[in-house]
Amino acid sequence: DYLWDDARGACFDRDKNHRPQSVLTHNTLRCMYWNSLPAPLAARFVKEHLCNPAEFWTPMPLPSVAVNDPLFRNVTTNNWSGQAEALTYQRAIRALENYGFYMLIPTLGRKLMQAIGPECRFVQQYDPFTGTPPVICEPGQPPQDAYGPAMLSVLEYTARLYGVSPVRDTLVWGSCSGAACRYTQTVNDHSWEIVNSGHGAEAFVDGRKVFTAGPDLRITTDLQGHILRADRYGQDADVHDIKL
């Protein structure tokens, strides 16, 4: 209630004197990362703001400030005044998962990887209209394109969409279509592997096949590979297209 403005459907910062600030930033997504919003409020923010192409769902989504806000600034220096931050992409995975918005995650992952490109520009922020990575450097210094959260974001999106991710006492498997690949996670003496043909996937625990799945699914299992639930990454995905 302290940050949420029900008339506008988002959270807003307050200054040191507790006065609400009117600028529409991405910070409601941060609250979703911490799972601190009631589900109806999160759903309203996603529907009204996050997925609005006039605000946050730009060609390169997740600008720090809504692009139609008077205080939005598309500047290349890293100051959170407008451009899409790699750190926000990293946080967005958990934020969207907390509230079941799984189908937004593949779009974000692919947009980020396209922006990073074959030149591997792991920078702090990206132009929300073009995806251009501004490579900033101080005079006499090499370009700063080795930003840790950008690298970690790519690793995590890859694991969520095409691989397997240990999440506490569960595993999250991704069978996104479009690329044939093999992904293995090894922890201590255990291995979890998913082999994706580009239109379906097979999952293995310690070399033992535990299920096959159709394309564009997000499958949650226990650590032994027993299926707990299935969700869709794609609009046409079939959660029943899983065989043990």
List each language-model region with its residue ranges:
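C-terminal beta-sandwich/jelly-roll accessory domains of carbohydrate-active enzymes
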Residues: 197-244
